């Protein structure tokens, strides 16, 4: 949804995930309902046109300075991200589509756009624990790793890191 909605012509305009996060701040139940509806509409419209999967939801925490993530993130608080992403994923499932949490282990803290640069997150694993909460608490069908280097774990980007993939499988217990 929002600025990164790829299918636009003859599709419902969906709000950015940050719009749902702002609604969460004042009206959590309404935000959960809206997130569920967004997931359902997104999946139903794509499936009606032969697209069977969308790489959503974004699980990055909104730390503020990352413009590439920006309004693609639901919220700064992991509890809000878990609730809203869970509701969106439920809507996807209701319309017959799986969910893919991204960008593991978290892209929201770094400023550079990983589509054009190679961001490095220099936080410790301990400092990243909030970013990992959505991956620990949600039941996801798939996870997309980030094209970001996390010095605390590896010199490779998470997408090419056996250490991060092992952490996802063994510590977080992801089995999708």
Language model segments and positions:
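Enzymes and membrane/adaptor proteins characterized by extended Gly/Ser/Thr/Asp/Glu-rich
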Residues: 1-81, 109-121, 146-156
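Second-shell residues forming the walls of enzyme active-site clefts
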Residues: 80-176
